[in-house]
C-alpha cells in the first residue's frame, strides 16, 4: 500500500504549478476521481483504527475529497458553508479573518449536524494558512464533539499546525507538503 501512496504523492506533486502570485490551480487534482479514490484509501488506512463518526469540511474545494473519505470510512459528511442554508433554524458559526487579506469569513453549520458524542475527521484538499481548518476545529469544539484527526492532500509548510490548537496526540495526515514559492 505504501508504493501506491508514493505514487499518489508524486502524481499530486506533478500537477502543482504555481503562478507568478504564488497561487496554483487545483482543478486538475480535486476533479480527478483516481486521485480522490487513492487519497480516500490512504485516509482509510490511516484513520480506520480511530473512532470517526463524521467527516467535516468547508465548502467548496474540499467537498470532493471529503465525500470520498466519508464514503470510504462509512460515515456521514458535514459541510461548513459561507452562507446560511434556508430551512435550517439554528446554526453554529465561526468567523475568522483570512490572513493578509483583511477579508472576514463566517462559516455556518446546522446546529445538530455535529453531535456531542461525535468524533470528527476534518478533511480538506489543501491547507495553506490553517485559518479555515482552525475555524472547523472551533466549530467541532462549539458542538462539544471531539476532533479525531486532520487529513489533507496538500499542505504549504507546517506553520499552520500551531493555529489549530489540536489535542495532544491528535493525528494530522498530509499526503504532500510543499514550500511556499
Predicted regions and their residues:
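Active-site/ligand-binding-proximal alpha/beta "capping" segment
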Residues: 118, 124-142
Amino acid at each position: 500500500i505504501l508504493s501506491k501512496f508514493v505514487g499518489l504523492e508524486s502524481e499530486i506533486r506533478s500537477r502543482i504549478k504555481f503562478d507568478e502570485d504564488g497561487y496554483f490551480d487545483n482543478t486538475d487534482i480535486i476533479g480527478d476521481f483516481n486521485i480522490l479514490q487513492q487519497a480516500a484509501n490512504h485516509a482509510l488506512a490511516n484513520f480506520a483504527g480511530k473512532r470517526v463518526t463524521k467527516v467535516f469540511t468547508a465548502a467548496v474545494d474540499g467537498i470532493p475529497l471529503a465525500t470520498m473519505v466519508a464514503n470510504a470510512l462509512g460515515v456521514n459528511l458535514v459541510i461548513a458553508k459561507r452562507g446560511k442554508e434556508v430551512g435550517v433554524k439554528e446554526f453554529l458559526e465561526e468567523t475568522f479573518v483570512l490572513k493578509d487579506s483583511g477579508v472576514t469569513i463566517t462559516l455556518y453549520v446546522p446546529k445538530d449536524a455535529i453531535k456531542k458524542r461525535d468524533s470528527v475527521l476534518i478533511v480538506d484538499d489543501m491547507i495553506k494558512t490553517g485559518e479555515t481548518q482552525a475555524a472547523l476545529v472551533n466549530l467541532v469544539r462549539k458542538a462539544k464533539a471531539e476532533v479525531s484527526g486532520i487529513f489533507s492532500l496538500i499542505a504549504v509548510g507546517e506553520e499552520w499546525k500551531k493555529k489549530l490548537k489540536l489535542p495532544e496526540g491528535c493525528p494530522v495526515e498530509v499526503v504532500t507538503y510543499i514550500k511556499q514559492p
